[in-house]
Regions:
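Conserved helicase motor core of SF1/SF2 NTP-dependent helicases
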Residues: 2-18, 22-23, 27-118, 122-203
């Protein structure tokens, strides 16, 4: 199904990749963005994720904004580290060819001539996801990744991701790819763990 992601983004401008931890959805999305940058199909990569997760609010974290935000964005940096030599990546980040920022920073912008990845989108509210998707400029590609079994939003907030995949399913140019436990690319035990928790949740 990672192959489906590759085929889909070649044909569509917005791709939702939905699946459990370890299925390589974020890694594949970042690889596709790096490929597009190398092929000069786009000028910039923007990686973002909601910065409120697991009950933590940025207001309660110590340090300046970069220090506060970076722990949330670490998995995106990790994927980039695997694909781009350290010095080159440093240069890209400094000249903003690659930007890694929390979702709130997308408000009011038009994201054009770039490849944009929203990771952990299950933790975006309806309003946040609508705000994000409507930032899209005419020559942008968007990949939205998420796992609907790992929603960290307060109970009163429904995941914007579950709403989006229901209401946007039949729009031309938008595709939804579902990854499953069989797509897990981490240690073989990860799939077994996910299956065990799935059994627990179903009982």
């Amino acid at each position: 199904n990672q192959r489906k992601m590759v085929d889909s983004i070649n044909k569509n401008d917005i791709l939702f990749a939905i699946g459990p931890a370890g299925t390589g959805k974020t890694y594949t999305a970042v690889a596709l963005a790096v490929r597009a940058l190398r092929n000069k199909e786009i000028k910039r990569i923007i990686l973002t994720r909601p910065a409120v997760e697991a009950g933590e609010n940025l207001g309660f974290l110590p340090g300046d904004l970069k220090e506060k935000v970076d722990p949330y964005l670490r998995p995106l940096y990790d994927a980039l580290d695997d694909m781009i030599p350290a010095e080159k990546l440093k240069g890209y980040l400094e000249n903003r060819t690659i930007e890694v920022a929390p979702l709130a920073f997308m408000r009011g912008r038009t994201l054009d001539n770039c490849f944009v990845i929203l990771d952990e989108a299950q933790n975006a509210t309806d309003m946040q996801l609508k705000m994000f998707l409507t930032r899209m400029g005419p020559t942008a590609k968007f990949i939205v990744t998420g796992d609907l079994t790992q929603v960290d939003l307060p109970k009163k907030n429904q995941s914007g991701l579950s709403t989006a995949i229901k209401i946007l399913d039949n729009i031309s140019g938008i595709d939804i790819v579902y990854l499953t436990g069989s797509d897990v690319v981490r240690h073989k035990l990860v799939r077994r763990i996910l299956e065990a928790y799935g059994d627990l949740n179903n009982n």
